[in-house]
């Protein structure tokens, strides 16, 4: 098996390097979101610009539902679990920041635990999501897109709400 030199001189196979990279990127997305949420008051977490738009709390509820459904018994069951009520994920029934963050942590713990258990020999294995076959790589990349989409929404809403009080999560613009 061909190896590549990864950061800090580690010798890894391509599959090992891929898994290490995606785990790192997902953890960065999680941390970025948490840094945005830390800047918000409880009421800001539940703010929505209109009835058709989702609050950060609802986006988090949806992400958690998706993570738990997709990554529980990942190799042996369809990623869309029969007990998942996706529509309920968009109901604003959470009232406290602690409830939101509990769901956030349940989702991420489920997802990252499953992701860390994948080995390179499983990357081309076929799994199903909504009765459609996907390789494990495709499933990971599907989630990379989905979670990044929602992380962007969360950060954008948080930045809008904080306005001039926003603390940049990356390199700030020069003023």
For each of these PLM feature ranges, what is it?
Residues 91-127, 138-147:
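Acidic/histidine-rich alpha-helical segments that form the ligand environment
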Residues 9-23, 91-92, 99:
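Short, charged, low-complexity loops and linkers
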Residues 2-12, 23-27, 34, 42-87, ...:
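Short, contiguous alpha-helical
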């Amino acid at each position: 098996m061909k190896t590549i030199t990864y950061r800090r001189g580690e010798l890894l196979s391509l599959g090992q390097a891929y898994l290490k990279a995606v785990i790192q990127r997902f953890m960065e997305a999680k941390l970025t979101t948490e840094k945005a949420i830390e800047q918000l008051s409880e009421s800001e977490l539940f703010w929505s610009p209109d009835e058709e738009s989702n609050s950060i709390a609802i986006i988090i509820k949806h992400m958690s539902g998706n993570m738990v459904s997709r990554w529980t018994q990942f190799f042996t069951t369809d990623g869309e679990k029969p007990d998942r009520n996706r529509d309920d994920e968009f109901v604003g029934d959470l009232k406290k920041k602690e409830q939101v963050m509990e769901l956030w942590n349940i989702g991420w713990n489920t997802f990252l635990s499953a992701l860390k258990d994948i080995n390179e020999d499983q990357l081309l294995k076929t799994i199903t999501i909504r009765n459609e076959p996907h390789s494990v790589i495709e499933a990971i990349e599907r989630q990379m897109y989905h979670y990044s989409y929602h992380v962007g929404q969360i950060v954008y809403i948080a930045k809008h709400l904080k306005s001039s009080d926003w603390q940049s999560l990356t390199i700030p613009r020069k003023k």
